[in-house]
Amino acid sequence: MIVEELKLLPSSKAAKDYLNNQNDMLSFFDYNIHQPTVFQQRLSDLQEQPYDRDALSKALLSYQKRFAFHDKAAQQVEKLKDPRSVVVIGGQQAGLLTGPLYTIYKAVTIVLLAREQERALGVPVVPVFWIAGEDHDLDEINAVPIEKNGRWRSHRIEEKRKRIASEAGLNKETLAKWLATVFRSLPETEHTLPLYERVKTLAGRSNTYTDFFAELLLYLFRDEGLVVFDSGDPSFRTLEKSCFHMLIQKTKNVQGAFAHQVKKLEQAGYGRPIITEETNAHLFYVEEGSRYRIDYTGENYELNGKNQTFSREELLEHLTLHPERFSNNVVTRPVMQDALFPVLAFVAGPGEISYWATLKRVFHECGMKMSPVVPRISATCVPSAVQKWFAEKQYSYEEAIAHGLEKEKEGWLEEQTPWPIDQVVEEAITQIRHSHKPIKDLAEQIGETPGKLANKNWSIIESQLRFMERRMKRHVRERFEHELSKFDEAERWLKPNGLLQERHDHVIQLLNIVGDDFIPRLISMNINKMGVHYLVKL
């Protein structure tokens, strides 16, 4: 495996300006990650914050032991008992097969940054992956793309109702059939069967979406000591209770702080990354597996979509009795994260950078500073056949990843075609339209009905000429089908379905080609430069 660096900035203006050290964007954050002393400063600031390390370590250790490949993760959890220890953290929804590749790249960034800062700071730094198990939109996590007859389709586990991922039971038989279809869609290699058996075993151990996600992530990072944490697991709710209590007490302040920061961000030209109603209390209440948004109007708390209201005292009483019924939204989840963990750095994708820019005043209202936000790595992987073809064509990887290969494909085909199909057809249409005009004019003079008929007649003539044009082009394409398929194969890797590979493909597709040591090999290459898009040559 070889890694090259490409310059390919994110499309988001906020993320781009953040990477480029632009003051307009950096002013929305407490720390400037471009400063060489940023992590020393953060470490110093963390000494002033209290954390219940024993309770946190105990809960995390118990959670790791639920999964098959937990040994290295459990060793890392022990470090958290050290009062000097800190964490590098990031998270994602519990996607099937760990979801799109950016999840893997986020975890790789967490591991690499934790190792780097443990050496630099001389204190234990634990890599933690926060699984957003309280998310309830299963349609965002219950499918992966598979390829069939050269076309992509979404392969989904159908869900009849909305439930949070930590409680959404996975039918073992349904999951096994779903998994078999995924592997049948892959090209068979020496790795396919053992990989299938391993993933099938991990799936068999899993009862929920988050279980399956954690089993697979811990297996993939089994040598790296990545610690997993499910924010939707009831066992962690007792730890979270005091933060929920504070957020309920400060609801009005949090609402105002968030609204103020969103307005400032919009005025600075960065739009509104989070759009919600002013009454949103930025908390959810879970009942019978369904999640209801809590609204606050200044007097009472109300469950959105359910005719149920609480006073502040009643809601706090529910929290005391049933902390497992409460969960965070996108605004308060970062606050909960930094309240539970001594966060040295938060690893973020481009979208997260945008929405974290709305949270500075929210953190301050809760008595905290925002942790430093570090962009995750970005990458595109290419197999050897595509590498060889690309070298022959001398195309730009940056251009292909950013824009696809359609322009190059059509240009190449035009160069190979000695027949001026477009020119001849356009000239014929112009000439025939000119010859047809007297008929059309005469018909319109005779009456409305003949006039309409003449227009329809011309439409039929033109459509037949266009039909002939398409058929001639199709015949030419069939003549060069073998070479054109190489363009399609390259684009399938570099811009699948018009998306960045990391936003479309899943890790099993790569492991099927290179084996299940792909992640340790990737980590050994220390690919953690900010603002770089890595080209990974498999």
UniProtKB/Swiss-Prot annotation:
One of its GO terms (molecular function) is ligase activity. It holds the Pfam family Rossmann-like_BshC. Its EC number is 6.-.-.-. It is an enzyme of class 6 (ligase). Keywords: Ligase. Involved in bacillithiol (BSH) biosynthesis. May catalyze the last step of the pathway, the addition of cysteine to glucosamine malate (GlcN-Mal) to generate BSH. Belongs to the BshC family. This is Putative cysteine ligase BshC. It comes from Halalkalibacterium halodurans (strain ATCC BAA-125 / DSM 18197 / FERM 7344 / JCM 9153 / C-125) (Bacillus halodurans). The gene is bshC.
